[in-house]
């Protein structure tokens, strides 16, 4: 059993490891509200394109 077969072979069905950003595939800082599933860094870049406006 080589390292390639063992790495990430554990099933991730729940928890932070099971979800990733749909833009950059990062697992950290996910915004899951409204079904976005985008990390906060990508959200700041794409917020205007998605339709979020900053009122301030």
Curated annotation (Swiss-Prot):
Keywords: Cytoplasm, Metal-binding, Phosphoprotein, Ribonucleoprotein, Ribosomal protein, Zinc. Pfam families: Ribosomal_S14. One of its GO terms (molecular function) is zinc ion binding. The modification Phosphoserine is found at residue 25. Component of the small ribosomal subunit (SSU). Mature yeast ribosomes consist of a small (40S) and a large (60S) subunit. The 40S small subunit contains 1 molecule of ribosomal RNA (18S rRNA) and 33 different proteins (encoded by 57 genes). The large 60S subunit contains 3 rRNA molecules (25S, 5.8S and 5S rRNA) and 46 different proteins (encoded by 81 genes). Binds 1 zinc ion per subunit. Component of the ribosome, a large ribonucleoprotein complex responsible for the synthesis of proteins in the cell. The small ribosomal subunit (SSU) binds messenger RNAs (mRNAs) and translates the encoded message by selecting cognate aminoacyl-transfer RNA (tRNA) molecules. The large subunit (LSU) contains the ribosomal catalytic site termed the peptidyl transferase center (PTC), which catalyzes the formation of peptide bonds, thereby polymerizing the amino acids delivered by tRNAs into a polypeptide chain. Coiled coil: none annotated. Its cofactor is Zn(2+). Zn(2+) binds at residues 21, 24, 39, 42. This is Small ribosomal subunit protein uS14A. Belongs to the universal ribosomal protein uS14 family. Present with 6490 molecules/cell in log phase SD medium. There are 2 genes for uS14 in yeast. Its main location: cytoplasm. One of its GO terms (cellular component) is cytosolic small ribosomal subunit. It is found in: Cytoplasm.
């Amino acid at each position: 059993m080589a390292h390639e077969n063992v790495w990430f072979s554990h099933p991730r069905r729940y928890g932070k490891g099971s979800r990733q950003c749909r833009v950059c595939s990062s697992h950290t800082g996910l915004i899951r509200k409204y079904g976005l599933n985008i990390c906060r860094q990508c959200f700041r870049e794409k917020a205007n394109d998605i339709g979020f406006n900053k009122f301030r």
